[in-house]
C-alpha cells in the first residue's frame, strides 16, 4: 500500500492510553496465541475515571473487548492475547460492526481502514497492567532511523500519527528488539476489577 488516504482509528480509549501507534497487520500469528481466563471480566481504571474495559470469551483463543469511556461511548474490538518471546501482548482490532453501524454511504465506508493496536501486558493479577508503544518515542526513533520498519506518517510534528505497514514477522522483530529500549513503552495503564467482578472470581 503506497498511500493511505484515510485511517479510521477506532480506539476510543486513546485518552486513557495516550495516542498510540497503529498497525496494518496484527502482532500475532496463529502459533503464539494464548488464552488466559484471568483476563475475563470487567475492569476499570484506577482513580476517578469511570471508563471500563470488559473482556468476554469469543473463541478458543479470542476475546471480545468492549471499551466504555467516561461519557458512556463504546467501542467493540476483537482481542487476542499472544506471547512474543517471554512477553505477553494484547492485540486489539476494531469490530466491523462499528463501521457497519455508521450512518454513512457505502462509498464512504470503503475508504475507512481498520487498524491494529497492541499493548504489552506486564501482569493480569491482582490488577491488570499494560503499556503501549510510546508514540513520541516512535516518531523520534523513525526520524533518525526511517528504514527501521515500514511505516506511514500522517500529519506533522507532535500531531503526527504513525501507522506501521510492515508485515507481521517484521513487526514482531521490531517490537521484540525494543522490549527493553528505554522510553519505547509509555506509562503503565493500571486497571482493577470492578467490585462485583472481584467477588465473582473468589
Protein language model regions, located:
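Long, low-complexity intrinsically disordered regions enriched in Ser/Thr, Asp/Glu, Pro/Gly
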Residues: 7-13
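C-terminal motif of bacterial Sec signal peptides marking the signal peptidase cleavage site
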Residues: 15-18
Amino acid at each position: 500500500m503506497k498511500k493511505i488516504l484515510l485511517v479510521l482509528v477506532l480506539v476510543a480509549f486513546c485518552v486513557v492510553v495516550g495516542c498510540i501507534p497503529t498497525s496494518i497487520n496484527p502482532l500475532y500469528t496463529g502459533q503464539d496465541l494464548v488464552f488466559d481466563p484471568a483476563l475475563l471480566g470487567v475492569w476499570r481504571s484506577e482513580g476517578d475515571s469511570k471508563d471500563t474495559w470488559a473482556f468476554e470469551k469469543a473463541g478458543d483463543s479470542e476475546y471480545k473487548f468492549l471499551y466504555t469511556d467516561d461519557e458512556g461511548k463504546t467501542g467493540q474490538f476483537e482481542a487476542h492475547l499472544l506471547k512474543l518471546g517471554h512477553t505477553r501482548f494484547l492485540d486489539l482490532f476494531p469490530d466491523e460492526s462499528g463501521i457497519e453501524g455508521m450512518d454513512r454511504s457505502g462509498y464512504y465506508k470503503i475508504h475507512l481502514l481498520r487498524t491494529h493496536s497492541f499493548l504489552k501486558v506486564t501482569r493480569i493479577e491482582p490488577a491488570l497492567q499494560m503499556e503501549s508503544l510510546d508514540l513520541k518515542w516512535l516518531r523520534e526513533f523513525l526520524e533518525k532511523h526511517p528504514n527501521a520498519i515500514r511505516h506511514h506518517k500522517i500529519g506533522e510534528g507532535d500531531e503526527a500519527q504513525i501507522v506501521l505497514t510492515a508485515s507481521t514477522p517484521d513487526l514482531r522483530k521490531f517490537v521484540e528488539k525494543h522490549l527493553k529500549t528505554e522510553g519505547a513503552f509509555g506509562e503503565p495503564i493500571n486497571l482493577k476489577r470492578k467490585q462485583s467482578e472481584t467477588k465473582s472470581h473468589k
